[in-house]
């Protein structure tokens, strides 16, 4: 407790017998784990997502817990985040990816085969519709509105109090 001048390094040691290597990644070789060669977020869609221990839990300088508590909480945070994320992705990632794929395929199909042909057809027909609409407006609607306007302009109202 108090002001620590050096940073504590958190490490987790596990026996090889108790750790299952069936996840597909060889954690014994840190070179393969650190640089997998594939950026899974190339467009930085989740750059605002902060899931590091220091980003979530922080103690001000004036209030520090015991060093062992801080180290254990950091280790438990990292382990629970890792295990829970893997667990949730096993059960949710595949169904949600399937649903998102169906949704985007449906939207793409609708956009490509229905919406864009309709818009292009409307844009091709619009010049002739514009000509017809202008003729209808000039021949029917403009004289009708002029007549109605002249008729109503000759009406005058007088209010008298009796």
Swiss-Prot record:
Gene Ontology CC entries for this record: caveola; cytoplasmic vesicle; focal adhesion; Golgi membrane; nucleus; perinuclear region of cytoplasm; plasma membrane raft; sarcolemma
Mod. after translation: Phosphorylated on serine and tyrosine residues. CAV1 promotes phosphorylation on Ser-23 which then targets the complex to the plasma membrane, lipid rafts and caveolae. Phosphorylation on Ser-36 appears to modulate mitosis in endothelial cells. Phosphorylation on both Tyr-19 and Tyr-27 is required for insulin-induced 'Ser-727' phosphorylation of STAT3 and its activation. Phosphorylation on Tyr-19 is required for insulin-induced phosphorylation of MAPK1 and DNA binding of STAT3. Tyrosine phosphorylation is induced by both EGF and insulin (By. similarity).
Compartment list: Nucleus; Cytoplasm; Golgi apparatus membrane; Cell membrane
Modified sites of kind Phosphotyrosine: 19, 27
Signal sequence, start to end: none
GO terms for MF: D1 dopamine receptor binding; molecular adaptor activity; protein kinase binding
Family, as annotated: Belongs to the caveolin family.
Stated role: May act as a scaffolding protein within caveolar membranes. Interacts directly with G-protein alpha subunits and can functionally regulate their activity. Acts as an accessory protein in conjunction with CAV1 in targeting to lipid rafts and driving caveolae formation. The Ser-36 phosphorylated form has a role in modulating mitosis in endothelial cells. Positive regulator of cellular mitogenesis of the MAPK signaling pathway. Required for the insulin-stimulated nuclear translocation and activation of MAPK1 and STAT3, and the subsequent regulation of cell cycle progression.
The protein's name in its UniProt record: Caveolin-2
Organism the protein comes from: Otolemur garnettii (Small-eared galago)
